[in-house]
Amino acid sequence: MRTLLTCALTALLASVSAANAGAVVWKFEHKALVGSESIAGAVAESSLMAPGLKTVCDFSYGMTISNSNLKAAGKVSEVAISNCHTDSKACTVKSSTAQKLPWSAHGTTVGSTSYVVVEGVKFSILYAGEECALGETLVTFSGTAGGKYDNTAGTFTFDKASFLATGTAIEGLTEWNATFSTEALGPHKGQLLELG
């Protein structure tokens, strides 16, 4: 009987461990977040590489985070895209808009590295210019973005390596380079946000 209970307990612990493999939680001051927190952040000069054209924009966001079932979760409810320009003299940016908000987010690990994965990402850029091949064309980018989280700086970075590590992609982009800041706006204001 004792052996049977030991085997059952071992199997249960193994299944819980497997279910939480790759799971991480949000932390402030090395303690797991209890309840929820509002986070804001931004990046200047985010580089979006599409076939034949590089577009640079500033992004800012607002997100609510929590730990759900011992896993970091979040909802990106606000995204502003501004100050966009291209590397082409012929092409300008007429407008840029985030769509289908909120976007869901969660934390994960690949090896020993923590990542923020944002799902349901969708934004559009309207290009202009008489000699621009994309002039008066609304280009929509959509998909899932995985960014490497830096616990010492409280930032997450989207780049080719982070997309590859997380198996994520944004349709229409060959590369997205951006390092987003994080800042708590509620009871944890002034504290460094960690993911682990």
Annotate each PLM feature:
Residues 11, 16, 33-35, 110, ...:
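Residue-level detector of solvent-exposed, low-hydrophobicity positions
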Residues 26, 121, 139, 154-156, ...:
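Short non-domain terminal segments
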Residues 142-170:
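Extracytosolic low-complexity repeat regions of secreted or lipid-anchored proteins
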Residues 1-21:
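Secretory targeting and sorting signals
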Residues 53-152:
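Predominantly extracellular/secreted and cell-surface proteins with exposed
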Residues 21-80, 164-196:
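N-terminal segment immediately downstream of the Sec signal-peptide cleavage site
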